[in-house]
A protein has these predicted regions:
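Bacterial N-terminal signal peptides that target proteins for export
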Residues: 2-10
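Bacterial N-terminal signal peptides
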Residues: 11-19
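N-terminal pre-catalytic segment of deacetylase/amide-hydrolase enzymes
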Residues: 20-94, 240-242
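Metal-dependent polysaccharide deacetylase catalytic core of the NodB/CE4 family, i.e.
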Residues: 36, 41-52, 85, 91-94, ...
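Noncatalytic alpha-helical scaffolds and linker/capping helices
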Residues: 99-100
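Short beta-strand and adjacent tight-turn residues that come in two discontinuous sequence segments
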Residues: 123, 214-216
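Short secondary-structure boundary segments
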Residues: 195, 217-219
């Protein structure tokens, strides 16, 4: 099957993801010809066409998964994330992440990932769980039972916390941790900064609260040399998701 790669798709870095050994992307951050490691893709909504900046069409999502498989790129299981960071010699890997826990993910993408047992992290903001267009705790617990799924912490309010005081940020994250423990029996070791934005105080707080990894929204390949509290991810949406 031949794919006609659109310019927007190249810009989105998906081609770079599939071509660690070729500098096909010439944007703000290029991948070196010898780069190996983990690329993280970030998705949000599925088949919610009125939100093009955060939505992906299901047919495109399926094609992404197919391309990854056909190019012998490994899906990273978050349960083995630390080992995957260390063991990167001559290996190309992809970590799937889904932010916010929208109902459209559960209804459209989850059945596909479940059937094929494709690993991923689902980041949820605890205040929104159970509200309109968001997953419920029962649905989240269903996913949490699977050994290829990790439920990550995405704050409580999903507000823009970077400019807030240390106490405001601390109260928000501690609230989310408390709810995680009440609902899932544990907090996650993974954190996703709301809007991908963080500061030194924010990063320091996340580390002090026991998280092992935190993700932003910037270009880069992950390996053991990277700051574990500034891990990169590439957002994939309708604009940059078609092939």
């Amino acid at each position: 099957m031949q794919f006609k790669i659109k310019k927007s798709f190249i810009i989105s870095l998906f081609i770079a993801i599939l071509s660690f050994q070729n500098n096909l992307y010439s944007g703000p951050t290029t991948l070196d010809i010898d780069d190996f490691g983990i690329i993280s893709l970030m998705y949000h909504r599925f088949e919610e066409n009125k939100y093009p900046s955060t939505n992906i069409k299901l047919k495109d999502f399926k094609e992404h998964l197919n391309i990854i498989r056909e190019n012998n790129i490994r899906f990273v299981n978050p349960n083995n994330f630390e080992q995957n960071l260390k063991d990167n010699k001559n290996q190309r890997k992809v970590l799937l992440t889904i932010d916010d826990g929208f109902s459209s993910f559960y209804e459209n993408a989850w059945p596909i990932l479940k059937e094929k047992k494709i690993p991923f992290i689902l980041f949820v903001s605890t205040r929104e769980v159970g509200s309109n267009n968001y997953m419920t705790w029962d649905q989240i617990k269903e996913l949490d039972k699977e050994n290829f799924v990790e439920i990550g912490n995405h704050s409580h309010t999903h507000e823009y916390l970077v400019d807030e005081s240390y106490e405001v940020i601390k109260n928000d994250i501690e609230k989310s941790i408390s709810i995680f423990k009440n609902e899932l029996g544990k907090n996650s070791k993974f954190f996703s900064y709301p809007f991908g934005e963080y500061s030194l105080k924010f990063k320091s707080l996340i580390q002090s609260l026991g998280f092992k990894y935190a993700f932003g929204q910037h270009s880069g390949v992950m390996d053991e040399t990277k700051d574990l509290y500034e891990l990169p991810r590439f957002p994939i949406n309708e604009k940059y998701g078609e092939i």
